[in-house]
Every structure is written in structure tokens, then in C-alpha cells.
Amino acid sequence: MKPARDYDIRYGQDIVARGSGSWGRYVAISTPSAWKVVEPLLDHPPEGVGMNRWLDRSHLIEVSDSLPDDVDLVVGIGAGRSLDHAKLVATRKRLPLVQVPTVISTGAIIHGFVADWDGRQIVGTLAEIDCEYVLVDYGVVKQAPLHLNTAGLGDVLCGYSGISEWRRNARRGVGPAYDEAIADASEQQHKDLVA
């Protein structure tokens, strides 16, 4: 898994309309509200659209399996739920992934993990994938309610997940050694932000 700083994030006005022309045959994962905003901007329609309702494992897999396999790409359109769902679909279908966030206050944009939840507890990982790139279209993001783009929760969650990714990667022998003192100081800083 690459770190957030290495993600290819492309910003601009009308970037979805321009960028989607190169997608070939693709499937999309979205939510009804996000799809309503982005669908009219797409260069050509997907071969299938999976609507995300929640992050329940059986729902994610059922939607994934209902989509065609003979495509070139998976595109996640929306906020955290749909972006995470798209990661699972791309992993299960062994396809590249492009993410199109409709809000920017979510860490799902830059983290390739999809947690497996049991109630309110993470019990495992459903998918791990790095996306090819992220398209942040200013016109799309501006259509979201202001509180969804200014909440800041995504920043805090990214900070926390960065610590856990560092710990996890160090255990796997990837990246720099985990330093408990630095991690504790960073975690305290994030706690102070929330307090």
C-alpha cells in the first residue's frame, strides 16, 4: 500500500467530463445522491452501476457480484462508503480503480483499506488496493452540503489511520521502523484536536 503522499490526485474544473473519456468499459459504485451529481458529467455510461446502501459485508459482496466482469475498470463515485465499496469491487474483480470523491472530508480518498465490520468493531480487512488516481472535480465537490466538505473529521481519521498504517507496515517489514514515542505524540495531537 502506498502512502497518501504518493497518490495521484488530479484537481480541476470539469475534470470528470474530461477524464472519463479514457475509461473504456467500466462499472461504477455510487450512492443515489452522488450518482445524481456525477452521471450527467460522464463521457459515456458505465456497463453497470452498483448502489451502496451500507458497509455490511454481505451487501458489499452481493452488489459486487451483480456487476459485469468483462470491464476494464472500477470507478468509485461518492463519499467514504461508495469509495470503500469500489475498493472491494476492484479487488474482487482484479481490476484497476479510479476514485471520484463528491466530498473531500473523508479519508477513504487516500487509504486503500476496506475494514470488515462486525457492529462497531473492525474484525478484519475486506480489501487492500491502491487506486490508479483520484479525480477531484471542483464543480462536483462544491455541490455537496458545506458541512460535508468542512467537517474536518476526514483529516483526524487520516491522522489516526496513518499511525495504524505505520504500525502495520512496520510489522510487515515495509517502510521505516515504528517509533512508539513519535506515534504517541501524534496520537495525542489528534486527541487534542477532537477535544
Please place each PLM-identified region on the residue numbering:
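Short Gly/Thr/Asp-enriched flexible loops that form oxyanion-binding sites at enzyme active sites
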Residues: 82-95
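Gly/Ser-rich catalytic serine loop of serine hydrolases
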Residues: 74-83
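Residue-level detector of flexible, active-site-proximal loop/helix-junction positions
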Residues: 53-56, 81, 104
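A glycine/threonine-rich phosphate-anchoring loop and its flanking beta-alpha core
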Residues: 92-187
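Oxyanion-binding "anion nests"
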Residues: 188-195
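Short beta-strand/turn micro-motifs composed of small residues
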Residues: 29-30, 78, 101
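Short glycine-/acidic-enriched loop or helix-start segments at secondary-structure transitions
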Residues: 37-40, 85-87, 109-110, 145
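ATP/NTP phosphate-donor binding region
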Residues: 1-73
